[in-house]
Amino acid sequence: MDKKGYELLGDPFLNKGTAFSAEERGALGLTGLLPPHIDTIEGQAERIYQQMERKGAGIEKRRFLMDVFNRNRRLFYYVFRQHIAELMPIVYDPVIAESIEQYCEQFINPQETAYLSIDHPEEIETTLRAAAGVQSA
């Protein structure tokens, strides 16, 4: 793995948070960058779910879950899989409609968004390649 330390923790596809083992923490330069407690994904998921339950309206729960999504995709999808019937209306419809309506007020992180312009269709492929981190051919 090329990424280490904060760079690794900043990658939501690689970040496991407190689920990194002691060996992984040492090898990946994470010693001291995470709380010392080592947890399983099951323990993390239980904690995240309990924290989400304490949130108020659906939009607050969605914002919280999207924050988890932005930090740790493994954990997000693990929790989502465990509670799919309950979380689907929060992450998707109908709460996403409210989220879209309030987009300007709650814009926090573009979640690696690719911005496409209807006025420049010739840029679509270049934009999508850039967003995916793929070099042009």
Which residues does each PLM region occupy?
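Metallocofactor- and cofactor-centric catalytic cores in central/energy metabolism, strongly enriched
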Residues: 1-137
